[in-house]
Amino acid sequence: KLLKVQEKEIYFTSGGTESDNLALIGCARANHRAGKHLITSSIEHPAILNTMHYLEEEEGFRVTFLPVDKDGRIRLDALKEALCEDTILVSVMYVNNEVGSVQPIEEAVQIVKNYNKNILFHVDAVQGFGKYRIFPKRIGVDMMSVSGHKIHGPKGIGALYINEKVKIKPIVFGGEQQKNVR
């Protein structure tokens, strides 16, 4: 209810890091036939940066790391230039955990979706969760990571919003909970 999405679009995880990993790896593996190019910013949380490096080094994806301006916001002109027909996913955090910059997510989503509506957009909203009113459907993102401890819940609880139209593959195997995704 807090995110204003359907219950079936919420996948509970062990925290923001697992949510980010599931979004990036699960999406990349499920959509690799459509393209092998991923985009993120150069100042993401290590859960994003390390996962992008893994996908680049171990699974053969090409990753573009967007530069930021003097205020720590992604350069939208660089995002426009980075998009190509091989791009399948863009991931940008909502609020930076070190410098506090709030990213222009709505504008970035518009740029991406105007280029190709099939490119998926993920937001790591862990730092902004509970502080900003972030509604994934309203801003047009396909996946969004959150963490319970940012809203006074215990550590070790997180969630990933995945729009019901998004194809994703599991990264943990053996259980059948949450539609075999986790």
Language model features: what each stretch is:
Residues 1-182:
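Pyridoxal 5′-phosphate
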